[in-house]
């Protein structure tokens, strides 16, 4: 029986998950969990990548103690962040987080003489000020001059483990520098941010074998033999691989710190309508494109829970929210003001105060406001998706931590008038492992993999509740339209 390890690292935590196929079902077990987060250092919010590497090896030591002598391993992380590596093969500094404020106004500055339409036609990627393109635009020029290689976060971790450097395609696409037509980094855009093609390791597809963990690590840690596979290294790309894909015309919602809502396409959709709606065409595994919208997601809920002293579990907060009447206020949950405020509760309350709406005060009111407005935002985006694609999405597959929030799943189903399939909650780790299984020939292809996922995990299904909330979605859409007009 083969053993697979998914190293799945998010903005606030990471874990090592053990995957094995037993009696025709995929089993998943958490082996090791650790904290992650950025901290202010030398004037910027930075990641401690040395901590991440140490925790990966601590997890692998636990794997060996389980009696497992050799494993496959894949690494996925969040997107857009990178590590600058010098000619000596070591990082030049701790990498800066995408939530750092250095890229404020970077889009406006870079596009002052380079039209947005031109960039979108080339890359198909939505405009977000933390994209790698704008981070590099704001990067220290002296530091870039010393840089031998620019490595995306999961590629850097794989490089440290094996000594082999590559740039995996799904994460590379999120940089907003990968040319859709030629499948290479775009020279014009690279020139705009003073970097060269040679500074990026070679591009590889998901499922490429990277190599074995270097011998030196075996002298420092008591770990099994490990072969590293370059999986779909962007965590959302792995989550989409780990989506059951139920329905004839299905969409996915990867619901975690960020919410990524979209569908899987065989050809990119980078026309003017997609551009104006700020949809993105991120590259997926096995020749696909993830046509999606990036939404603030459960970050807002995570911040509020923390500001409440972490005294409630998310389950308890969902129960409290269930007791509160929904839609007492409309909130554009994707507003940039919620990206990294000093106090999220105050920011939500100020927003409601400024828009002359009911102010949420109690934990239940705050979480009802968050969940109901996320559901409204999802339903609104599903309507847009239908219009752009020219057909109706019939099923929404919700994966990730948000798939456990029954209140939000049911609201989304009702508001969007769509069937919702929730689960697996660990879709990112599942997708990470599935790519490894396909590479090792234990699973034939992505279709067979998704059938295995559907029969291996307990999925919950939600159907719309007829006429329950009247025209609330139209009222929300009018609110967003009026808000946009006020900002012009």
UniProtKB/Swiss-Prot annotation:
Keyword RNA-binding: no
Nucleotidyltransferase in keyword set: no
Record: residues binding substrate: 79, 234-236, 294
Enzyme Commission number(s): 2.7.1.5
Residues at the catalytic site: 235 (proton acceptor)
InterPro entries: ATPase_NBD, FGGY_C, FGGY_Carb_Kinase, FGGY_N, Rhamnulokinase
Gene Ontology BP annotations: rhamnose catabolic process
Keywords: ATP-binding, Kinase, Magnesium, Nucleotide-binding, Rhamnose metabolism, Transferase
Enzyme class, first EC level, given as a word: transferase
One of the Pfam families matching this protein, by short name: FGGY_C
Residues that coordinate or bind ATP: 11-15, 257, 302, 401
Known catalytic reactions: L-rhamnulose + ATP = L-rhamnulose 1-phosphate + ADP + H(+)
Family to which this protein belongs: Belongs to the rhamnulokinase family.
Protein name (database record): Rhamnulokinase
Gene giving rise to this polypeptide: rhaB
């Amino acid at each position: 029986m083969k053993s697979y390890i998914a190293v799945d690292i998010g903005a606030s935590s990471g874990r090592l998950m053990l995957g094995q196929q037993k009696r025709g079902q995929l089993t998943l077990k958490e082996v090791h969990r650790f904290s992650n987060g950025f901290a202010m250092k030398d004037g910027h919010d930075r990641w401690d990548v040395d901590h991440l590497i140490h925790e990966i090896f601590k997890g692998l030591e636990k794997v060996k103690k389980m009696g497992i002598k050799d494993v496959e391993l894949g690494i996925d992380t969040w997107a857009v962040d990178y590590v600058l590596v010098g000619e000596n093969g070591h990082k030049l500094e701790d990498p800066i987080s995408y939530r750092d404020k250095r890229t404020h106004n970077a889009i406006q500055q870079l596009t002052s003489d380079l039209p947005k339409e031109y960039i979108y036609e080339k890359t198909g990627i939505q405009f977000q000020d933390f994209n790698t393109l704008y981070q590099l635009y704001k990067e220290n020029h002296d530091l870039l001059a010393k840089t031998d290689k620019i490595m995306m976060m999961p590629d850097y971790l794989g490089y440290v483990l094996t000594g082999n450097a590559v740039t995996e395609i799904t994460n590379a696409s999120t940089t907003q520098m990968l040319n859709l037509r030629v499948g290479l980094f775009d020279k014009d855009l690279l020139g705009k941010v003073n970097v060269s093609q040679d500074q990026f390791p070679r591009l590889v597809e998901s499922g490429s074998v990277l190599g074995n963990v270097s011998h030196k690590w075996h002298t420092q840690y008591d770990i099994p033999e490990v072969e590293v596979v370059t999986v779909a290294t962007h965590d959302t790309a792995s989550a989409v691989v780990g989506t059951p894909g139920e329905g004839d015309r299905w969409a996915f919602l990867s619901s975690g710190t960020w919410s990524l809502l979209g569908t899987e396409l065989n050809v990119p959709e980078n026309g003017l309508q997609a551009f104006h709606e700020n949809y993105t065409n991120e590259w997926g595994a096995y020749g696909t494109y993830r046509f999606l919208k990036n939404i603030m997601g459960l970050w807002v809920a995570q911040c509020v829970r923390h500001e409440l002293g972490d005294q409630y579990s998310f389950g308890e907060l969902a129960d409290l929210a269930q007791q509160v009447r929904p839609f007492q206020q409309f909130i554009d949950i994707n507003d940039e003001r919620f990206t990294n405020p000093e106090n999220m509760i105050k920011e939500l309350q100020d927003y409601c105060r400024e828009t002359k709406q009911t102010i949420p005060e109690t934990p239940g009111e705050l979480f009802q406001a968050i969940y109901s407005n996320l559901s409204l935002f999802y339903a609104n985006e599903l309507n847009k998706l239908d219009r752009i694609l020219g057909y109706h999405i019939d099923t929404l597959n919700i994966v990730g931590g948000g798939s456990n929030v029954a209140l939000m799943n049911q609201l989304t189903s009702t508001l969007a008038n769509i069937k919702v399939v929730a689960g697996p909650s660990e879709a990112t780790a599942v997708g990470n492992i599935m790519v490894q299984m396909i590479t090792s020939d234990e699973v034939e292809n992505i279709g067979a993999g998704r059938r295995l996922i559907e029969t291996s995990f307990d999925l919950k299904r939600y159907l719309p509740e007829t006429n329950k909330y009247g025209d609330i979605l139209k009222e929300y859409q009018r609110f967003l339209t009026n808000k946009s007009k006020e900002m012009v």
